[in-house]
Regions:
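Glycine-rich flexible loops
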Residues: 2-227
């Protein structure tokens, strides 16, 4: 049995709206080496306020890991959950950035930003992990420092955003961090391992987080939470 999300009006997902055609096949939780490590990183990001849920119920932030069949990504409507476990992830097996569609399996459909994650894996063969997080101070700090960014007219969850991110990943392979200018407060990091991406985000917070210069930990709320 499959369920299809065809339009943004029809498919609210707790992160805003799914803007791609989503073919979801209900299935057991994905079995993926490294998933526990990915979920542990996600929990650290949640505790740091880089992933979470706003008062209106809209979630923000998602993580993914390349697999032999595609990639696993945190599922839709999970932003407010601290620890997901395998059940909180969806396996994306097929996608088309140009066609604005993807196919996924799991107890829940893939995140609304899953197509952007797919674009990174497609553009950079060395990328194994992708993190999309939100932070106003980090967003502003990276921009002020001249970080790479997507166009302002490329909105979240759209083919335009996916293409823009893929272009950066293709030009700067292996690892990088960028600002999603058309997705307020949104940043995206990618790299060859979970550890590499975690280190990249920590480095960015340490060096570009506007409100806490010199802090060696993730501290988006003014207090240090994670080393």
């Amino acid at each position: 049995m499959t369920a299809s999300c065809v339009t943004s009006d029809a498919c609210p997902d707790g992160e805003g709206y799914v803007k791609y055609i989503c073919r979801h096949e209900p299935a057991p939780a994905p079995e993926q080496a490294g998933l526990a490590e990915l979920d542990a990183l996600r929990t650290e990001l949640f505790d740091a306020g880089l992933i979470g849920q706003r008062p209106d119920g809209t979630g923000f932030g998602n993580v993914s890991l390349r697999s032999e069949k595609g990639f696993v990504v945190s599922a839709t409507a999970t932003g407010g959950v601290r620890e997901l476990g395998a059940e909180g992830y969806s396996l994306v097996e097929d996608w088309s950035v140009a066609g604005n569609r993807l196919t996924c399996r799991g107890s829940l459909p893939a995140s609304s930003e899953a197509l952007t994650h797919a674009a990174v894996y497609e553009a950079d063969a060395d990328a194994r992990c992708v993190v999309h997080a939100h932070s106003r101070p980090l967003f502003d700090g990276l921009l002020e420092a001249g970080a790479l960014h997507t166009p302002r007219n490329a909105a979240y969850g759209t083919p335009e955003m996916a293409v823009a991110v893929a272009d950066i990943a293709r030009r700067y392979p292996q690892e990088g961090i960028l600002v999603m200018l058309g997705h307020d407060e949104g940043i995206l990091a990618y790299g060859p391992s979970i550890r590499a991406v975690a280190s990249l985000i920590s480095f960015a917070v340490r060096n570009f987080f506007l409100s806490s210069p010199g802090c060696g930990k993730m501290c988006p709320h003014g207090a240090c939470h994670v080393s």
